[in-house]
Design a protein with these regions (language model features):
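Short secondary-structure boundary/capping elements
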Residues: 46, 58, 89-93, 157, ...
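Short, structured patches in soluble enzyme cores that scaffold and shape functional sites
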Residues: 68, 78, 114, 145-147, ...
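N-terminal pre-triad scaffold of radical SAM enzymes
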Residues: 2, 47-78
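Iron-sulfur (Fe-S) cluster-binding segments and ferredoxin-like electron-carrier domains
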Residues: 77-89
C-alpha cells in the first residue's frame, strides 16, 4: 500500500522513540500490512454503489468518494484498496450524482469523502456545493477529511476555501467531519484550523 505523509505530521513524531510513538504508528507502514488475508471491502461498499463514486447504503445518506487521494495515507484505513492506488471507484460526474440525489427525496444529507474531500481543489469543492446546495430535501452537506489533523494549513492559510464554505453554509448547512485519533494530534496548528472553520460558520 502507498505511503504519503506530510512534513507537518512527521514533525509530531518523537524520533527518539519512534516505534512506540502513536503518530509514527498511524503513518509509517508496518510489516503487518503484508498480511493480505481478509476482505478489502470490509463495509460492502461495492454492493451499495449506485453510480461511479456514489454509494447509497443508508436511506437518508448518500456517500460520495470524491477522490482517491489523501494528504496522508493512514495505516488503519479501511479503503486501502483504492486510496492512492486507483480512481476506479471515485466520482467522475458530479451532475449525474446530483441528479440521483434530487430524485431520491429520502436522502437528507450527503457525505463528500474519499480519499480526503479537502484534497480536492477549491474549484471542485465549489462544484459540489453548487450542485447539492440547491436540492430542497437536503438538510446538510458533510465533508469527510483528515486535513485539520495532517495538513491544517490547507485550511487556515486558504482564505478562498474558507470564503467558499462560509458562503455556501448560508445556503445549506455544512459540516466538516474529521478524525483526531490521539492527543498528540491536537496541536496549536490543528486548533487554528478548527477555529478557522468555526469562524466561517462551519
Amino acid at each position: 500500500f502507498p505511503m504519503t505523509v506530510t512534513r507537518y505530521y512527521l514533525s509530531l513524531i518523537d524520533w527518539d522513540n519512534p516505534f512506540c510513538d502513536p503518530v509514527f504508528r498511524m503513518c509509517i507502514p508496518s510489516i503487518e500490512e503484508t498480511d493480505l488475508s481478509g476482505d478489502f471491502d470490509t463495509s460492502g461498499e461495492a454492493d451499495n454503489t449506485v453510480i461511479s463514486g456514489l454509494q447509497h447504503k443508508y436511506d437518508q445518506t448518500a456517500l460520495i468518494l470524491s477522490t482517491h487521494r489523501c494528504a496522508m495515507y493512514c495505516r488503519h484505513c479501511f479503503r486501502k484498496r483504492l486510496v492512492g492506488i486507483s480512481d476506479d471507484e471515485t466520482a467522475d460526474n458530479i451532475e449525474e450524482m446530483a441528479a440521483y440525489v434530487s430524485q431520491h427525496s429520502e436522502i437528507s444529507n450527503i457525505l463528500i469523502s474519499g480519499g480526503d474531500a479537502f484534497l480536492n481543489s477549491n474549484q471542485v469543492i465549489k462544484r459540489y456545493l453548487e450542485q447539492f446546495s440547491s436540492i430542497p430535501h437536503l438538510d446538510l452537506i458533510r465533508f469527510g477529511t483528515r486535513i485539520p489533523v495532517v495538513l491544517p494549513m490547507r485550511i487556515y492559510d486558504d482564505p478562498e476555501l474558507l470564503a467558499l464554505l462560509k458562503t455556501y453554509t448560508q445556503k445549506k448547512q455544512i459540516y466538516v467531519v474529521t478524525q483526531f485519533n490521539h492527543p498528540n494530534e491536537l496541536t496549536d496548528e490543528a486548533r487554528k484550523a478548527v477555529k478557522a472553520l468555526l469562524d466561517s460558520g462551519i
